[in-house]
């Protein structure tokens, strides 16, 4: 019994450490063009919001509009370089395909429904940088809510 409890504890610790590590990562840092997009916008990694900050919405209250816009421009750069966006226009089908490939989501998955809702919510925005950050923030917030609801289930 003690061994079983120890295994449960270790599993929980690893899961918590993994989630903490992911939330500390910078948004977009997993993409190949991350350094290029930072350089194109004269930013450093210190200027970019963390995944945890964005998924919790803290980025909106802890930073000025210019910081929000600059982070959005890096996100737009990444989306454009990956062929998912051109200017302020999404390629919704490519975004969906890329998201499914990255997350392993299956048809009917709530994460895909959340992605679709986020694209719908932001599709009419004209500023490409603000639009990109809002899309990323919307998806990260939805994923956090879904993860929390799945843990409680």
Curated annotation (Swiss-Prot):
Protein name per UniProt: Pheromone-binding protein Gp-9
Stored InterPro entries: PBP/GOBP, PBP_GOBP_sf, Pheromone-bd_protein_Gp-9
GO molecular function, one term: pheromone binding
Annotated GO biological process: response to pheromone; social behavior
Originating organism: Solenopsis sp. (strain X)
GO cellular component: extracellular space
Extent of the signal sequence: 1-19
Keywords: Behavior, Disulfide bond, Pheromone response, Pheromone-binding, Secreted, Signal, Transport
Family: Belongs to the PBP/GOBP family.
Location(s) in or outside the cell: Secreted
Gene3D superfamilies: Pheromone/general odorant binding protein domain
Disulphide bridges, residue numbers: 37-77, 73-129, 118-138
Role according to the record: Colony queen number, a major feature of social organization, is associated with worker genotype for Gp-9. Colonies are headed by either a single reproductive queen (monogyne form) or multiple queens (polygyne form). Differences in worker Gp-9 genotypes between social forms may cause differences in workers' abilities to recognize queens and regulate their numbers.
Known partners and oligomeric status: Homodimer.
Domain of life: Eukaryota
């Amino acid at each position: 019994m003690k061994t079983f409890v120890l295994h449960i504890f270790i599993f929980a610790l690893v899961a918590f450490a993994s989630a903490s590590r992911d939330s500390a990562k910078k948004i977009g840092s997993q993409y190949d063009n991350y350094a290029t997009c930072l350089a194109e916008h004269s930013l450093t990694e210190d200027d970019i919001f963390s995944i945890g900050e964005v998924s919790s919405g803290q980025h909106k209250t802890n930073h000025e509009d210019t910081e929000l816009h600059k982070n959005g421009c890096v996100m737009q750069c990444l989306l454009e370089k990956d062929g998912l966006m051109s200017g302020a226009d999404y390629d919704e089908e490519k975004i969906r395909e890329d998201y499914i490939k990255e997350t392993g989501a299956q048809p009917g998955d709530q994460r895909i429904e959340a992605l679709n809702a986020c694209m719908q919510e932001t599709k009419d925005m004209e500023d490409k940088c603000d639009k990109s950050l809002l899309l990323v923030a919307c998806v990260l917030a939805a994923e956090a809510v879904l993860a929390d609801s799945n843990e409680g289930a």
